[in-house]
Amino acid sequence: MADKKEKLFSDFSPVSTEQWMEKVTADLKGADFEKKLVWKTNEGFKVKPFYRMEDLEGLKTTDALPGEFPYLRGTKKDSNEWLVRQEIKVESPQEANTKALDILNKGIDSLSFHVKAKELNAAYIETLLNDICAECVELNFSTCQGHVVELANLLVAYFQKKDYDLKKLQGSINFDYFNKMLSKGKEKGDMVQTAKALIEAIQPLPFYRVLNVNALSLNNAGAYISQELGYALAWGNEYMSQLTEAGVPAAIVAKKIKFNFGISSNYFLEIAKFRAARMLWANIVASYNPECLRDCDNKGANGECRCAAKMRVHAETSTFNLTLFDAHVNLLRTQTEAMSAALAGVDSMTVVPFDKTYETPDEFSERMARNQQLLLKEESHFDKVVDPAAGSYYIENLTVSIAKQAWELFLAVEEEGGFYAALKAGTVQAAVNESNKARHKAVAQRREILLGTNQFPNFNEKAGEKKPVEAKCCCGGHDTC
């Protein structure tokens, strides 16, 4: 072995930042450096045209290690593995079961069932999950919010009846009290009462998450990245604050929260977003001094449980930028979005089929969506390297910049009284609506590029009967959830 490291490019003398700037200034021929080369992001910060090692000085992000608090570099130490999820809207439990068994043989290891509450009973669950090995696949369920406790009881009873090792089961129930307030301005029931009952009902399944932060809805509504993250943190903290005040231990609350983020096409900023999200959430949870629920080596200086500070993240490609026309271009968008989330170390991911905007996805579009993730795993090996972005001058600086912007927004929401108070006041909705309008205007003026729409559109396309699909809740209605 060599006694010393060989320096690459030793024949070339090093170039200082000053020399780079002199060259850039000369090439600009008098043009303003700030206007020409500095990117003023929608997130509220500026991005330089180049970064160097000196730009890492003072950044604490470079001290982070994979699998260690504050989890900036991911919650896993040995791999970048994530679960490939596909959604199934259950019209018939038998048909849904047949479809689930089929796609489990095609690369899926996480299922998401949208079930109708009015049909829920033990026989329904048995038919739906028949022959599906619950210890081998993550199972996620959505239903009307008023029936989540009933669903939890049915699942626990089913798994116990099947004699599963309950500690090997992973999944979630999509209870989210605040999402309806966000989209409809309506409240239904008592959040604390329902959440406590749900946590109690799901207690036999320690790795099932039942308190959801559906920041995906912000992303799909046109929120900027810093808004999505800042509001998501406040959203999660609202669960922590209200439920700990109601007597639920902080560690239990934290371990029942799941974050569902969207993924926009802003490639590098999305990588930075997920890294910043884990770091900020870990510090929020740590501030509650959660006590370990069992003997654990992963404790902080004050004995707080650092396992509870791990953010569980599901990511889904955005629908904000999916187009009705020239829809196959959506495949390009969702592919780069999936790459961002994979490199950032999410726990599970859904790639939305390219045709979802105008029809129920068919077998072809669903297969394409699955294979987009499988390509990243099996051909590109994105699941093998933990946080490959670590040490990148550019991404480390983006991570810090996004973290600062999101944290400022989080603090502003907390000063307003928390996420619940901000929703009641309409602050969150107004801010996201403004972003939506600004982004639509930017697309119309070609300041935000949407390939196939305002850049290289297909003028010869015959759209036929294409119409936007009208969204419905998981119960099949609009206001019954």
Task: Indicate residue ranges for each PLM-predicted region.
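Catalytic alpha/beta core domains of metabolic enzymes, predominantly
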Residues: 293, 297, 312-318, 327-328, ...
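Conserved, mostly hydrophobic/aromatic
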Residues: 44, 107, 163, 281, ...
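Extended, hydrophobic alpha-helical segments in both membrane/secreted and soluble proteins
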Residues: 274-280, 284, 315, 335-338, ...
